[in-house]
Every structure is written in structure tokens, then in C-alpha cells.
Amino acid sequence: MGIFHTVDDNEIKSGENTDIYFVRTSDILALEGKNPVVTVEITAQNLPDEWGVFCGLDDALSLLEGLPVDVYAMPEGSIFYRGEPVIRISGHYRDFAKYETSLLGFICHASGIATSAAIIKACAAQRPVYSFGSRRQHPAISRMIERSAWVGGVDGASSTSAPAGIPLAGTMPHAFVMCFEKPLDAWLAFDRHAPGDVPRVMLCDTYCDEKREALDAAKAGASAVRLDTPSSRKGDMRQILEEVRWELDINGFPDVGIFLSGGLTADDILKYRDIVDAFGVGGSIANAQVIDFSLDIVEIEEKIYSKRGKKSGVKEVYEFDNGDHLLLPKGVTPPEDAKPMIKIFIKDGQILTKPDMQKSRARVLSSIENMI
């Protein structure tokens, strides 16, 4: 056991990290000599919004690799709707029952973050959005947070634990500015010593009026000014942004952008996107509501079954060129222009292909262009 209250990779991969009723279920089934061949599907009956982004498949495949099962799934980054299966597993039930806890945890959390990131990115209307929220969650999962946010469409992440291939983005904390006698001294020091490829985005609300500090920063060579004004401050944020933009423009700095952060929601993005050039979003992405996936048996020994409130039998999901989906029982012929979404990823425990993070993100971005 490590020094922090976290579960290690071996405990997850071995199935030791599970709910106790799966242990008891497997033990009793073994004593009764039962281990039926089943097919299960993972679906969400309720979503935080009208649609979700499927994420976390890479971890799910790593978890199930080596088990005597076949795994089918939507490609990571797929848009899904209520009741659509995102993963399907076939095998002897006891061979994978104890992995349900970790399996659902992987995709519930990652998909929730990716979905929130995608909604916020769609609201931003082509303006850059950066993930600033890893500090709002346990540090042990910061890499997962940044990866999921990236799949959801953000343009960069603040945490140095982000996977390779994700651009790191950040400006400066208020503490940095406060370590100098004046904000100007901090900005000039940043400009002198920060790597040349780091944008000169200067934090402009530490001590003084935002428009005054923004103008001073622009004169000092800022490429953009960042406002992180807390909601407790008196005044209207829209008015503050308009004043800053006005002063920058009228004083000859129309190319100096405005970077906004500080407790932003999707509604805030919609409200300010016409005047803000880039957004840093923390809790609304990192603390996103999880997707409430559940795993249910739909076939036992090739006979269709379901519990109450669920649709029995294996299902296929098809997508049309306009983004519409069609859910059909397996074996029913779809329209000619419908493309199957569910693909095989594991055959007899062997991974056939794993998600590519960049392709997953591209899939999301191509899907959300007209979603908001």
C-alpha cells in the first residue's frame, strides 16, 4: 500500500478492486457449478445533457486484456445517446464479473469529463479552451482528467502530468505577481525569462482596476491579458470585459487578446464568447458530472434476457451522415446509408486495436460543430 489513499494498477488489473457483492456472487456461482456464457451491454439511461462523448475505452481494454472474452465498443470519441450500448462483452460470466466496478469507473468518469469538455468547446465557437481543473480532483487521476478533456476537444491542459501529445498551457498565478513589488515588475520578469514559445499572457486583476492593469500589460508587450476576477468582486463581468476591450482598442492595442478564467461554466462561455479570445476552464470540466453507465446482461446462453426497465437482446447502433443514430436489434437489416458504430476491439482476450487519443479528439471535434 502506498503513502496516499489510492488503489494501485495491480489491484485494479487483478480485479481486487471490486464491490463485495461481486466476490460473493462469484463464490456462490462456483459452489453451485454455474458459469453461464452471457452477453452484457453497457448503457446510460440518463445523461447530463442530450448527448454524451464516449471516453475511457483505452483503460477499459487494458483492464479486460487477457480475459477469455470478446469486447465490442463504439470508437472512443463517439457521440452517444440515451440507451445506446457503448460496450458489449461476451464470455463466461464469472470470468469477468468482478471487473465491473473498475470497468464502469473508467468510462463513467472519463466520459463525463469528455462530455463536459465537448459541450464547453462547442459553446466557445472556435475560440481556444484550456483545461485548468486538475487541481479540483485527486492528483492520482490528473493524467486521466487531462486526457479526457483533450478527447473532449480542449486545446491544451495546465497539468504537467498530461499525456504526451497534449500542449501544456498556463499563464501565471496571482502568487507570482504578488512576489514582486508591482505587477509590471512581474510581467517584465516573465517576459525576460519564460521560454520564447510561451505566449505572453499577463494576469491583470491582482491589485488594481482590470482595465488599468490590462493597458499597462499591453504597453509592456503582452500578447493577451488574463482576467481571473472572482465572482465575489463587485461589478458586472460583461461590463468589465467591455471596458478592457475598449481601452485596449482605443489605445492602439487591438491585437492584444483577452483570456478569461475563474469558475466558468458553459453558460458563461456563451455569454462572453463574442468578446473573449480564449478561455481557461477548471471545475466545469474536471468536476463534470459522471455518466451514469450500467452493465446489464442481455443474453444468456444465446437466449435473450433483460431485467426490468431494460431492452433485451444484443443491439447495434448505426449512424447516418447527418449525425442521426438508429438503434436496432442485432440481425435486423439497417438502411443502406446507415453505418455500424460498434466494432470489435478484443477477441479471445487479445486486443485487436486501441484508441488513438488524437483520432478520438478529431472524432469529437468533427461531431460537435453544429451541436450547440
Placement of each model-derived feature along the sequence:
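A broad, low-specificity signal marking well-ordered, structured residues that form hydrophobic/aromatic
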Residues: 40, 69, 87, 130, ...
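Structural beta-strand/beta-sheet cores of well-ordered domains, especially the beta-sheet scaffolds
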Residues: 27, 36-42, 128, 198-200, ...
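A generic structural signal for short, non-catalytic loop/turn and secondary-structure boundary residues
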Residues: 33-37, 64-67, 82, 124-127, ...
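Flexible, solvent-exposed loop/hinge segments and secondary-structure transition points
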Residues: 1-94
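Buried, small/hydrophobic-residue-enriched core segments of structured protein domains
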Residues: 48, 78-80, 87-253, 266-267, ...
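Gly/Ser/Thr/Ala-enriched C-terminal appendages of enzymes
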Residues: 1-22, 32-34, 49-51, 61, ...
